[in-house]
Amino acid sequence: MANAETRIDSASARMFAALVCLLVASVGSAPLTAQSSANAVELLAAFSGEPAIQYQPLFQFSQESRIVAVEIYAVGTESTTAQYSGREHAWHVVNNILRITTADGFEGISGVDTYYEVEFTEQALLELHSVAADLLALQSLDPVVVGAMLKRSRPELSDEVRASIDIALWDLAARRADRPLYQLLGGRRDSMEPYASLPFYHTLPEYVDAVNEYATLGYRAFKFHVWGSIEEDVRLVELIQQTFADSGYRFMIDLEGAYGFEDALRLGGVMDERLFIMLEAPIDDQLLEQYAQLRSRLAVAIVPAGYNIYTPEFIRQGIDTAAWDAGRFDATAIGGISTALQLLTIANDADLTIDIQSWGHSLAQAANLHLMLANERTRYFEAPMPKQAYEFGMKNGDLLDVGRVIAPRGSGLGIDVNWEYLATADFYRKLGSEE
């Protein structure tokens, strides 16, 4: 728990000293890169550009720090079931929560959302539970080392399950350090500007009403998930520009890759850049050359969806083709904090902004928020609406404070889960394993 102490015996101290010498020697011979990082300390150094050897004890394994219990929860509420495009059915969202406990009383927690078209399911819960024995048998608590091991031993695992494990291990390390995760990642700011990300509505007045409603909470920027039909979407843009011309608000549209090039060009041409600041996923993410053409011909910023294609190679291809004004991904969908740090390092080296996604429940929001706070190029935090629905089961899930989103107080992710209250959800499953 929070008051537990990390113990380092004399043998560990000797190992630590040897590692210092090894790292000093390696720094003098070759610069570290995020992709070549063999462990979390090297990854932190590559991302921040500063030495991180002082954090080595946080990831060190011993019998006292071994994982002794694994709990997995799948939680869903009808209040988060929603459409994100007029071309899709409503999605049922399951918040998959991983809780690991060590022999010396520390915890590591993560939350990863998964989406299902027909009904809530325990699919991700069961996949995550299939790794419980692997977690109890771990001989390392380093998320980079563990991630590499699982790629070899469990290559079939989804990126969402990898993210669950990776984020929980980063949370565990930050809790051992007794500091917020963003500080462990090198972040110095503790708040940023949010925007209200709205689900799909079936009528134009509902969009106007939603803007007015969420503006009362302090939001000044809003993202619309729309029909994916050019005529209806143009009518929405024109209505918003007429209604909120002098409001000082800013707007974004997420097309979920629904358009072809010509429709994307037409909609972007209608959008007044003084009000509309971003067009997300106008076309299929694979069409990098067409993205580059849209970017060169439109005033509004162009970003990809970032959900299905997010490898380092793809990020580099997007950079080489000048496809985007900003890249995009969600740490909970791409394999976790470790993968996100690798991609952020590539983007930062190329002066490419990354618009990190944070749609999801509070634990998923927090994981991405800590990354954003550590990455100065990321400007906006995406806050899913309806706001309270995504805070279900959390004691301090409200991250909004006077028009800013703030890092939760406390170590690690900083989110305090109401474990008993989770069982009141519309959909609830729990599995566990112990030593």
Task: Name every feature range the model reports, one short phrase each.
Residues 59, 64, 69, 101-176:
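Metal- or metallocofactor-binding catalytic centers and their adjacent structured scaffolds
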Residues 190-298:
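Metal-dependent enolase-superfamily TIM-barrel catalytic cores that perform enediolate-based chemistry
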Residues 1-12:
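N-terminal secretory signal peptides that target proteins for export/translocation
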Residues 29-45:
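Signal peptide processing junction and immediate N-terminal pro/mature segment
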Residues 53-104, 109-117, 386-392:
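Structured beta-strand/loop patches that form or line metal/cofactor-binding pockets in enzymes
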Residues 275, 286-404, 408:
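Shared catalytic-loop signature of beta/alpha-barrel
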Residues 105, 165, 178, 254, ...:
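Conserved, mostly hydrophobic/aromatic
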Residues 16-28:
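Bacterial N-terminal signal peptides
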